[in-house]
Amino acid sequence: MGSTSTPPHVLIIGAGITGLALAQALRKHGVSFAVYERDPDPLHRGKGWGLTIHWSLDAFLRLLPQHLIDRLPETYVDPDAVAKGENGNFLLFDLRTGETKWKVPPAKRLRVSRERLRRLLMDGIDVQWNKTISSISQISETAVRCEFSDNSSAEGTLLVGCDGSRSKTRSLLCSLAGNETPVRSENYQLPVRLIGVSAALPSRIALKMRALDPFFLQAGDPATSNFFWFSFLDTPINNDREDRDTYECQILISWPYRKDGSNNIEIPCHNVDKIKLMHSLADGWVEPFCEVVQSIPEETEPKIISLEDWPTPPKGSWSNLGGTATLVGDSAHAMTMFRGEAGNHGILDVSNLLEALIPVLTSSPHSPAKTQEEVINEYEDEMTTRTRPAVLRSRKACLDAHDYPSITADSPLVARRGAFEDDDLEYLLN
């Protein structure tokens, strides 16, 4: 039987991009849901940075109602570039010579502000803030219950963990799996350190970078194996700053950090010293890369990113409680940013899950649809098979980025993007 007499109600844990995309898709299909987020308010984590939706773009558009698709230009980093049909080239440069070393294979893509996209996806969604999940239990064959740290609780027919790379839902479901050797639910930390900023650069500097690419670029330092990432977050036509003749830019510098390294660079405690470190790491770089970093004001607030991942373990490593609970996105397959695919896999998770689940949630009790448990098991089979190699490709891309001689045509750092399983990187787990 496809469903029971219990009306479907989906508990969405996490109000990030994947959780909100899931909510909008359920709303589009008339399925009851509730969204719970541990943050106290939408602005708790700041404005956020950029997001590229590329090979999952078609799936993403299928999830959304038409009125939100029509408003997507509100989220674009550079609406003019999109209107002109510019996709960007996603080049990798040599920071010492300025030479273009690699070009990531082109694809149709949208570069959006993560914060503006999240705000758009909140349209019409009643997010319950300050809700940190603390326990999960199956209360019947078709119902699940979760409790929150404020002593409140919620019940539904399906709980979906969308609570990010350090997912509490993941930890709880792994502990409920009953495996003789429990799966480690904590992330693996890569031997790399990263400092990033969001800074408003004057047009005279930003336009030098825009001449290289209208959206983003990356670069490596052959002398140190340090790495540089740059992207635009807005332009003079779509910002509301007092000085409109500026471009908000995302600037990241990362470097290898070896366990046995005697010359490891430590991240300073004070913000002004972190910015000074970024300035010093750019010494010896050619223009415009050096100028961009040196122009970051010392009063800028930097952000430290811990580069972590969680290679999706085999099916059954977490309990889906008889098909009443599951994971999507970073909760199921946290990966580094070095292939820009985490969000795309999360979107595909939601799309695949909903495509199979909607017929079950909207069918009559006597329809021949699959059971919800069958659908969840099949979803997890596909998702774990697809995303484990994706996590490892992103790990290899990160490691290659910080070992300059490893950046070759075969490196995942510059190779094609997409959902495929044609390489074996299991050795990275040793």
UniProtKB/Swiss-Prot annotation:
Membrane-spanning intervals of the chain: none
Carbohydrate-modified residues: N130, N151
Native species: Arthroderma benhamiae (strain ATCC MYA-4681 / CBS 112371) (Trichophyton mentagrophytes)
SUPFAM superfamilies recorded: FAD/NAD(P)-binding domain (SSF51905)
Residues engaged in binding FAD: 9-37, 307-330
Cofactor(s) required, per the database record: FAD
Span of the signal peptide: 1-23
Keyword presence, Glycoprotein: yes
Organism domain of life: Eukaryota
EC primary class: oxidoreductase
Gene Ontology molecular function terms on file: FAD binding; monooxygenase activity
Keywords: FAD, Flavoprotein, Glycoprotein, Monooxygenase, Oxidoreductase, Signal
EC number: 1.-.-.-
Record protein name field: Probable FAD-dependent monooxygenase
